[in-house]
Amino acid sequence: MKRSMYAGRVREEHIGTTITLKGWVSRRRDLGGLIFIDLRDREGVMQLVINPEEVSSDVMATAERLRSEYVIEVEGFVEARQQANDKLATGMVELKVSALTILNTAKTTPFEIKDDVEVSDDTRLRYRYLDLRRPEMLENFKLRAKVTHSIRNYLDDLEFIDVETPMLTKSTPEGARDYLVPSRVSQGHFYALPQSPQITKQLLMNAGFDRYYQIVKCFRDEDLRGDRQPEFTQVDLETSFLSEQEIQDIVEGMIAKVMKETKEIDVTLPLPRMSYDVAMNSYGSDKPDTRFEMLLQDLTVTVKGIDFKVFSEAPAVKAIVVKGNADRYSRKDIDKLTEFAKQFGAKGLAWVKVTDGQLAGPVAKFLTAIETELSSQLKLAENDLVLFVADTLEVANNTLGALRNRIAKDLDMIDQSQFNFLWVVDWPMFEWSEEEGRYMSAHHPFTLPTPESAHELEGDLAKVRAIAYDIVLNGYELGGGSLRINQKEMQERMFKALGFTADEANDQFGFLLEAMDYGFPPHGGLAIGLDRFVMLLAGKDNIREVIAFPKNNKASDPMTQAPSLVSENQLEELSLQIESHD
């Protein structure tokens, strides 16, 4: 029989009609001789009623065999439900079954197919096809489909061209580790799976495509966390002849359209803008969460003259004030915050509380001389908690920024219904890497430096600024972009500043440098993390919830057991040997 409609879409207007439904048995109940079945499909659940006095003995026998997750086909008459269920969209109606067929049986599932089920993440991933049956998960992927549909329509209307770029590319040394693919034909040579289509999309601008986009899979072999996966999807854009402001206007329009069509939220444009320096100094993060205050305060000058060398001799002393919540933090709680602070390089965490109008705590005695000035600068009030970090400016900012976010979550200070977008602009071109012992690109080596700072490529790299911009949502980097270098001489200077010899630059990027000999236009773009965007719209805290078949924190798939060993024959074809490192 042909399905008439989805079970979750049956409504009062269908009363009096005979329909055919197909789906899964969510629940079966036997009450007073009647059998009640909750039939589930992707659109929801509908109650079926099987009355032994109104169906054949075969139908009744089939109904008695039903168990959870059996796949069935039913035909019946839609009636008004005697006792409505306001919790279901179909709660005003039920189906009086006249015919019933079992299409497939099911073993007892390892967990219940329902929302808020308590089960380990690895079990969910091991049986992902069952996990995805849960209504909450289905809603996540309907939302994801709406977002991608909205984005495609918006960019198509602006005459962007959707172009697929290669999945097998050249490995480059900048950025995260590549996933490498050995070549069978060119033995000893490797492809890399793309971390992004950065260079190929720039070459499309050289080809005259003018406006490119792609919703594309990317790959990075990096340590995983809640908002990262080894393979992820990004909305990739590139344009020619536009300024950074024009590119940002396009992206803002796209964001506003998505928010209106998926959340019915009107986003006020233009979005707020914040410099990188303000973000780091006031929020302790280059992706500030602006849904709450608790800004970082610089006390370096204020504490210079006090008799406490930890403060007076530190390169920087900064603090955050936890307003009106000092009584929520015992010494044991603050010890836990101190251990947390050490993860970000801090040597410790100093603190005082405002109790009975006075400062109290381990360092209060050192602050007596400046108590009035300190209270005024920090706008202190009764029951405030002040947390200090004395260290380098970088460590102080990073530590207090992380503490700020943790405390806001602990104290439930964040309005989860808010969506605060902003641009972070005026980025440094380079970041110092302690691990590498050199400057690295803050974004990538194809970013255009500002005209005012480009001369420092041969001088102080810390002073070089980039024409770069990140879009931030609720403390997450949603995407990043920049204007790109289109002049060969500037690109060669950039590679040299990053420590490449001319031969190394030519070996890695010679094809790009050669392309710059053939009229490369001014261009720029941006990429937005689609998984992360949908995660935030869905109110989740892990992108696994919006990726159909994700990996776990070990970059493994418990369902397929990937990555897995391969046969000796496969290795021989690729001229590879596996060495044991016991």
UniProtKB/Swiss-Prot annotation:
> What are the subcellular locations of this protein?
Cytoplasm
Which residues lie within the region annotated Aspartate? 198-201
Q: EC number(s) of the enzyme?
A: 6.1.1.12
Picking any one GO biological process from the record gives: aspartyl-tRNA aminoacylation
Q: Which SUPFAM superfamilies match?
A: Class II aaRS and biotin synthetases (SSF55681), GAD domain-like (SSF55261), Nucleic acid-binding proteins (SSF50249)
Q: What GO cellular component is one of the record's annotations?
A: cytoplasm
InterPro entries assigned: Aa-tRNA-synt_II (IPR004364), aa-tRNA-synth_II (IPR006195), aa-tRNA-synth_II/BPL/LPL (IPR045864), Asp-tRNA-ligase_1 (IPR004524), Asp-tRNA-ligase_1_N (IPR047089), Asp/Asn-tRNA-synth_IIb (IPR002312), AspRS_core (IPR047090), GAD-like_sf (IPR004115)
What GO annotations for molecular function exist for this entry? aspartate-tRNA ligase activity; ATP binding; catalytic activity, acting on a protein; nucleic acid binding; transferase activity
What is known about what this protein does? Catalyzes the attachment of L-aspartate to tRNA(Asp) in a two-step reaction: L-aspartate is first activated by ATP to form Asp-AMP and then transferred to the acceptor end of tRNA(Asp).
Q: Which HAMAP family match?
A: Asp_tRNA_synth_type1
Mind telling me what this protein is named? Aspartate--tRNA ligase
Q: Which organism is it from?
A: Streptococcus pyogenes serotype M3 (strain ATCC BAA-595 / MGAS315)
